Amino acid sequence: MHILVLGAAGMVGRKLTERLLRDGRLGNSDITRMTLQDVVAPAAAKAGFPVDIVAGDFAVAGFAEKLVADRPDVVFHLAAIVSGEAELDFDKGYRINLDGTRMLLDAIRLAGGGYKPRVVFTSSIAVFGAPFPDAIGDEFFHTPLLSYGTQKAIGELLLADYTRRGFMDGIGIRLPTICIRPGLPNKAASGFFSNILREPLAGKEVVLPVSEDVRHWHATPRSAVGFLLHAATMDSTAVGPRRNLTMPGLSATVGEQIAALKRVAGDTVAARIKREPDPFIMGIVDGWPRNFDAKRALQLGFTTAEKTFDDIIRIHIEDELGGKFVA
């Protein structure tokens, strides 16, 4: 099996790649080749099969055709400009998140010869906009309030239509906000959800730009990888024509996050959080969904690695900090 990962240098892309390289299999099939793409070269990888490293912008004309020329069996489309950056740079957001996605799907469509890969597309809960019900189900209509959400919503429609026409076997998964993200902060407007936990655990002070009553939907990197692997191997006939699914997660307020941090790591760690409201971030967060009913995804076999927000913090300490944090 040949696997292509677009956006392989990003956090979720790296985690997915590490898991695939470690397992050497996807479902019941041995991996025989992997292609890892990003705008910057993903890290070189050692494996018992060829691993091609490709650096380049997949939204440049002709680039996607090169990526699918060898007909990968599974395509993980993780490449995207994140929410805050897409809002600040309108042209860049649409070029990457919309035009790039269309170019990739068209490259697959035009490959011909009966080529029909499984395409796993990472969408976002940002496709939904206020006003919200208490818990948002898959049937809730798309009214995104950000450019990023609009781009992802259009990507969902394209994926469903190209699948309906028989050009690919697509599954779109709406990821919760991933928490706790390892590494340095990125330009995602949601980054503070991870920052206020990751930085204090590393002994650093951090700014909280919103109020503690802000509620949001979260899942760990470990769960995100599990979602992607299940989407790539599940029986897609059970999904039917509604090809995009909201992934399960945990709904929690910022205050509940901080309370969990205190329980797991102590008051001294939580005291490193400094409250400094940011009107730009607050304006974006006001239009975000807060809670979901992921019943359909659960019925189709998607599961999370965490059951409580304490678990989210413990998983980060275990996976990223070697089991230790700065008290």
Please annotate each region the language model reported.
Residues F58-I96:
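NAD(P)H-binding glycine-rich loop region in Rossmannoid oxidoreductase-like domains
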Residues P200, S223-M282, F325-A327:
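Mid/C-terminal beta-alpha module of Rossmann-like enzyme folds, strongest
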Residues C179-P182, L208-H218, A231, G240-A252:
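Glycine-rich Rossmann NAD(P)(H)-binding loop
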Residues R102-L146:
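Conserved Rossmann-fold NAD(P)-dependent oxidoreductase catalytic core, especially the SDR/UDP-sugar
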Residues M1-L26:
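N-terminal Rossmann NAD(P)H-binding glycine-rich loop of SDR-like oxidoreductase domains
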Residues P277, P289-K295, Q299, T303-A327:
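Amphipathic terminal alpha-helices
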Residues A130, L145-I171:
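Active-site Tyr-X1-5-Lys
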Residues A160-R215, P221-G226:
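NAD(P)-dependent short-chain dehydrogenase/reductase
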